[in-house]
């Protein structure tokens, strides 16, 4: 209460800032660690930009409006004029919070600060928004987002913020894609990757109307209108990993039917304990330690040892009615022609075509979903005259665009995930690479596990030089972090080098400095 006889909640140090919620009889009602308390007005100074709760017309009061960008690309500037320097840009459809207007310009919150955009390219939403902070024990209403965010962050208990019936910020939780959406680089705004509807991403923080997220160790942002925030305290289901009898299983949640679909990935990392559930936001660090599935992160130029007959035998035992039975020789032939792993090629075809039974596979002899875009898969898919033609064509395309370091969609020559490898741009399904790798594991297990962990895997650091041979100079340089398969170590007077499988099919092997590779544990 507002008197000296009330119990003490805590104390404030000289210079600390507080949010004043009200004033009466010489006392200020303030927010203190998520609760309300009182301090004497004689010991605080109210700044000129403060909100005066006793005077709603106080010019310091921030009245917020929400608006949607109505331009293909809208520059955000330091000041309210076209002569002011651009500090970033907004994409069409993004939502912004307007905190002021001046001469046809809107002052908005942007990247944790403020910026200006032309009002003519904004569509202002009708009505004013209020913000409700929700905890397990209370709900607090606030007139603007900044104040609500500050109060939530100061709370010791878990909390989230709702506005217009939608969660707009939270202390912890995950983010679910409302449809196929892009993830953007926080600094440049460049598209990093994309994910399918229903994909769950780890929540990092909300910065204005952009939500920072993580997937497979990569951080980027998504537009708040493209996702739904699920605070931990609401208990919404999501995907997870678990182990059983030494094997690792992925329980993938489907929000449309409320059920988990399960598949075995391969051997379980030794640090995981049976009976525990592990979050599924980073495939490489399940349980907080290295959990690289070998076939998912092995460069696909590492050839397999299987014959066409062995592939057919696997198909026959796994799915006796599969139309793919008898095509083993074509997968091996294409793999040899384009220097790629035959186990990968057939596993990719199995996943995309449903063991050869899909309508696209049956009608168009297209086993790889080539050109089967998310918006219209069947009509978009390319047709081929024979199975052999389809396999050869798609292998050539993958070789040129995804496995070749000079390819336009090269992100590392392995299946990978949403941070690196083919999965970055080949498919919106964030588990696409993992599912193909799980099939590769099954083929290998049926053939005596001859290829599993044949090479030690590592991450080659971006900018590292690559050498054609130990006798010749540098032949290239990595533009990004990539996975490598180490054949052997070569010690020289100049230092240690690794001979690695080359992503460039012109060479069987290339060499890199051992110090530029971070070794990882695979299973």
What are the language-model segments listed below?
Residues 1, 42-70, 78-79, 120-130, ...:
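Intrinsically disordered, low-complexity Ser/Thr-rich linker and spacer segments
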